[in-house]
Amino acid sequence: MSTGTFIVSQPLNYRGGARVDPVDASGTEKAFEPATGRVIATFTCSGEKEVNLAVQDAKAAFKIWSQKSGMERCRILLEAARIIRERKEEIATMETINNGKSIFEARLDVDISWQCLEYYAGLAGSMAGEHIQLPGGSFGYTRREPLGVCVGIGAWNYPFQIACWKSAPALACGNAMIFKPSPFTPLSVLLLAEIYTEAGVPPGLFNVVQGGATTGQLLCQHRDVAKISFTGSVPTGSKIMEMSAKGIKPVTLELGGKSPLIIFSDCDMGNAVKGALMANFLTQGEVCCNGTRVFVQKEILDKFTEEVVKQTQRIKIGDPLLEDTRMGPLINRPHLERILGFVKVAKEQGAKVLCGGDLYVPEDPKLKEGYYMRPCVLTNCRDDMTCVKEEIFGPVMSILSFDTEAEVVERANDTTFGLAAGVFTRDIQRAHRVVAELQAGMCFINNYNVSPVELPFGGYKKSGFGRENGRVTIEYYSQLKTVCVEMGDVESVF
């Protein structure tokens, strides 16, 4: 498949083990191909009746799935992981067409996705409670039980991967899931739904409802939904938390960030430069945990900046389906204009643009309406600038200088966010000392933006709470029941 040729011809909701058109509507949306600006799908947003049917089907499937042993669930999840590996190219291509990221990156996302399913398949068979001995031969035990119907609400930057990160632990624990993707990227999650069905999950265990805010509200407020897991912006996360609170539903929130990347003078310069590029320009900079505040110790500021600019200017921009492309278009035109607006404000506030920050128009005629820009490096930045304080969510790196360790830690923590942070240094004592002081949920030492599924991922402060990935996530998709067993006679105070 080549850029500019794809068009959606099938329904985009998934319920009861098949693609379906929603039975009612709460509006319509259009999905675009960012590389060309073409509309590739016009679809109906799910209304209350459709949401009710999705929940109803999920409840029925939950009764079957939750009664299976952990090993039975394990085998089905392993089969789903195998099918994802088998269909890797198809999934990655769909992701690239709808999201705009390079096919090179999309393939990595698919690999992380099947690894996530394999990891939680392994944990499904090991879920267990505890036995506690009590006086007189009595005892107690705990059971770790599923929650019921869970809702996953995804973001548009990693559509397929996020759906796997949310559904794999949910299903491993015995839950059902209804997933609502971003209306910007409605396509690839349908492939995951089909894969789960092919692997052998009961019909209705993993349903997809399309829509925007109204559909999301219907899901969050539904009386039969047991949990919400959301990835997206802080304002939307706050609304979801408020809606869920009225129903006393637990939530996992993976929200925004303005993460610090600290480069000490004793770093390995080559690795630090590569780390800074990884921290700012993956998926066109549209990554919540990006280290966009790059603090560089003054002794190496000039050398580091020179090398970062040189490497940034070498990034190949263009058709995301071409093998040598490393940066594709941004998600849509309003977002592109928003990012360019941030660069404009940065210049007005005194920042200096060393490279990029402007529109990029590819030579290929079919790409001329795409949403491209050159990756941007800013210097002369101050902590009070808009580009340093607010999440930009685009390919814009802000470089700031610092003198001492104590100073940079204080400045790094001066933010309402707390998703991620990174440190580059050869001094291992300093590295551990600094990350212990950083107020962030995901910290990297001498690397950045790697995401092994074995490690928990999530934030501090306004970046959210709860975790995705790692063993601990099992606790967020299950509940603990305590059973007390009396082996003697009841001792009564009456």
From Swiss-Prot:
<dbReference type="InterPro" id="IPR015590">
    <property type="entry name" value="Aldehyde_DH_dom"/>
</dbReference>
<dbReference type="GO" id="GO:0006081">
    <property type="term" value="P:aldehyde metabolic process"/>
</dbReference>
<protein>
    <recommendedName>
        <fullName>4-trimethylaminobutyraldehyde dehydrogenase</fullName>
        <ecNumber>1.2.1.47</ecNumber>
        <ecNumber>1.2.1.3</ecNumber>
        <ecNumber>1.2.1.46</ecNumber>
        <ecNumber>1.2.1.19</ecNumber>
    </recommendedName>
</protein>
<dbReference type="GO" id="GO:0140087">
    <property type="term" value="F:acetaldehyde dehydrogenase (NAD+) activity"/>
</dbReference>
<dbReference type="GO" id="GO:0004029">
    <property type="term" value="F:aldehyde dehydrogenase (NAD+) activity"/>
</dbReference>
<feature type="modified residue" description="N6-acetyllysine; alternate">
    <location>
        <position position="303"/>
    </location>
</feature>
<feature type="binding site">
    <location>
        <position position="180"/>
    </location>
    <ligand>
        <name>NAD(+)</name>
    </ligand>
</feature>
<dbReference type="InterPro" id="IPR016160">
    <property type="entry name" value="Ald_DH_CS_CYS"/>
</dbReference>
<feature type="modified residue" description="N6-succinyllysine">
    <location>
        <position position="59"/>
    </location>
</feature>
<comment type="similarity">
    <text>Belongs to the aldehyde dehydrogenase family.</text>
</comment>
<dbReference type="InterPro" id="IPR016162">
    <property type="entry name" value="Ald_DH_N"/>
</dbReference>
<feature type="binding site">
    <location>
        <begin position="232"/>
        <end position="236"/>
    </location>
    <ligand>
        <name>NAD(+)</name>
    </ligand>
</feature>
<feature type="binding site">
    <location>
        <position position="391"/>
    </location>
    <ligand>
        <name>NAD(+)</name>
    </ligand>
</feature>
<feature type="modified residue" description="N6-succinyllysine; alternate">
    <location>
        <position position="303"/>
    </location>
</feature>
<dbReference type="GO" id="GO:0018467">
    <property type="term" value="F:formaldehyde dehydrogenase (NAD+) activity"/>
</dbReference>
<feature type="modified residue" description="N6-succinyllysine; alternate">
    <location>
        <position position="30"/>
    </location>
</feature>
<dbReference type="GO" id="GO:0047105">
    <property type="term" value="F:4-trimethylammoniobutyraldehyde dehydrogenase activity"/>
</dbReference>
<comment type="function">
    <text>Converts gamma-trimethylaminobutyraldehyde into gamma-butyrobetaine with high efficiency (in vitro). Can catalyze the irreversible oxidation of a broad range of aldehydes to the corresponding acids in an NAD-dependent reaction, but with low efficiency. Catalyzes the oxidation of aldehydes arising from biogenic amines and polyamines.</text>
</comment>
<keyword id="KW-0963">Cytoplasm</keyword>
<comment type="pathway">
    <text>Amine and polyamine biosynthesis; carnitine biosynthesis.</text>
</comment>
<dbReference type="Pfam" id="PF00171">
    <property type="entry name" value="Aldedh"/>
</dbReference>
<dbReference type="GO" id="GO:0005737">
    <property type="term" value="C:cytoplasm"/>
</dbReference>
<feature type="modified residue" description="N6-acetyllysine; alternate">
    <location>
        <position position="30"/>
    </location>
</feature>
<dbReference type="InterPro" id="IPR016161">
    <property type="entry name" value="Ald_DH/histidinol_DH"/>
</dbReference>
<keyword id="KW-0560">Oxidoreductase</keyword>
<dbReference type="GO" id="GO:0051289">
    <property type="term" value="P:protein homotetramerization"/>
</dbReference>
<feature type="modified residue" description="N-acetylserine">
    <location>
        <position position="2"/>
    </location>
</feature>
<dbReference type="GO" id="GO:0045329">
    <property type="term" value="P:carnitine biosynthetic process"/>
</dbReference>
<feature type="active site" description="Nucleophile">
    <location>
        <position position="288"/>
    </location>
</feature>
<feature type="modified residue" description="N6-acetyllysine">
    <location>
        <position position="298"/>
    </location>
</feature>
<feature type="modified residue" description="N6-acetyllysine">
    <location>
        <position position="344"/>
    </location>
</feature>
<dbReference type="GO" id="GO:0005829">
    <property type="term" value="C:cytosol"/>
</dbReference>
<feature type="active site" description="Proton acceptor">
    <location>
        <position position="254"/>
    </location>
</feature>
<keyword id="KW-0520">NAD</keyword>
<dbReference type="GO" id="GO:0019145">
    <property type="term" value="F:aminobutyraldehyde dehydrogenase (NAD+) activity"/>
</dbReference>
<comment type="subunit">
    <text>Homotetramer.</text>
</comment>
<dbReference type="InterPro" id="IPR016163">
    <property type="entry name" value="Ald_DH_C"/>
</dbReference>
<dbReference type="InterPro" id="IPR029510">
    <property type="entry name" value="Ald_DH_CS_GLU"/>
</dbReference>
<keyword id="KW-0007">Acetylation</keyword>
